[in-house]
Amino acid sequence: MLNNSIRVRATASVANVSCGFDCIGYAIAKPGDIVTIEKQDQPGIEISMSGIKYESIPVDPENNTAGKAILSLLDTVESKQGFKVHIEKGIPPGSGIGSSSASAAAAVVGVNELLNKPLENSELLVHGMAGEAVASGGFHADN
């Protein structure tokens, strides 16, 4: 049976731990973002949002961390599949606990699953980093 939708939760994280700045990190059980992804017949990414302080986050896929991460993944696997993406922000934007990276991570995991896992989990990081570049201006994985 083929799945047409998936719901993925990504937790907050801390990457700047004492003298282990960007080297030592950990995940936090709460809060977290919930990303619901549904296949759609037409190509493209359609993003909607709800939750904590989401109003300032762009829904244009090129300017949204989850959207950009999905576009990066789709480009790599050469897929024209379209998706509706709903991001429920549980991690406050700008809080320093991985708000942007959580949305991107959940998005690439979910899309990869809906595409029947064309990529290994280890190959997903680079696509999350493409999303993070939208928020931070840099291609890095610090959360």
Put a short name on every predicted segment.
Residues 1-95, 113, 117:
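ATP-binding N-lobe of GHMP and related small-molecule kinases
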Residues 80-143:
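Gly/Ser-rich oxyanion-binding loop with an adjacent helix/lid
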